[in-house]
Amino acid sequence: MKEEKYMKKTAAVLAAAAALTMSVYASPQTEFTKGQWEINAGMWNTKAKTRTYKDNSAWNFNGGVTYGLTDKAAAQFQYYGLNSDDTDGRSHELNLLYSVHPQVAVYTGYNHITMSDFPIGVFGAEKRENDIAQLGIIARQPINEVLDLYAKGALGSKNTSIWEAGVNFALDENIDLNAGYRYLNTEGSRNKNVSYQGWLAGVSYRFGGGSDGKAVYSENDIDYSALENKGHKKEESMV
């Protein structure tokens, strides 16, 4: 009887570990594989707002590509449209990411933000461009075998801050669906910032990097709590 319980417990933990192995590569990535590519694309329903001006939202394309330089670092290009109902804009990011934990990555990079078609009285000009140096962090928390919560945040020059949080659903080990809310705030003039915010959703696809997909962390580095509890419940129902 004891051997049977031990085998059930071992099977539950192994199943959890296998599921998390798939989960750690979920988008947005906090762990990388050398030579692996990730392509992501989606839509962002964003609106523009300043202290004295507010515009209705419009749907924008967002997308990017990430490439694993090593098993700990990656290079990334990311694009976000910043069009609202009456204004135009876009954001181009170039980032270097580094995994400090299977569920946490930090990054630094350059962000070029263009804002145009604002009424002249808002910024004193119709068009504004910001060149931004930024530092950020990405964190994820597995909920079960296929569902993660994620959060991203960055601070940069020109009084810039970027925040995003949402959920990620893994269709398989290479394809994810995600949805969340994104907020971008940056300098429009010396005494007036502009913010872009709204709901977004997208899909990501990973390929390349070999077939082993081995992580460079030990099992002790990974938070198994959400998956272990599920395994224990299954064990109790079987006894």
Q: Language-model segments: which ranges?
A:
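Gram-negative (and chloroplast) outer-membrane scaffold detector with strong preference
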Residues: 72-152, 157
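Outer-membrane beta-barrel "beta-signal"
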Residues: 98, 135, 169, 195-239
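Outer-membrane beta-barrel translocator/channel fold
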Residues: 46, 50, 83-89, 108-132, ...
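Repeated loop/turn-to-beta-strand initiation elements of outer-membrane beta-barrel proteins
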Residues: 37-39, 71-77, 102-108, 143-149, ...
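Hydrophobic, lipid-facing positions within transmembrane beta-strands of outer-membrane proteins
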Residues: 59-63, 90-94, 133-137, 161-165, ...
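Residue-level signature of outer-membrane beta-barrel architecture
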Residues: 67, 98, 139-141, 155, ...
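Gram-negative bacterial Sec-dependent N-terminal signal peptides
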Residues: 2-28
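Short glycine/proline- and aromatic-enriched beta-strand/turn motifs that initiate or cap beta-hairpins
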Residues: 25-83, 133, 142
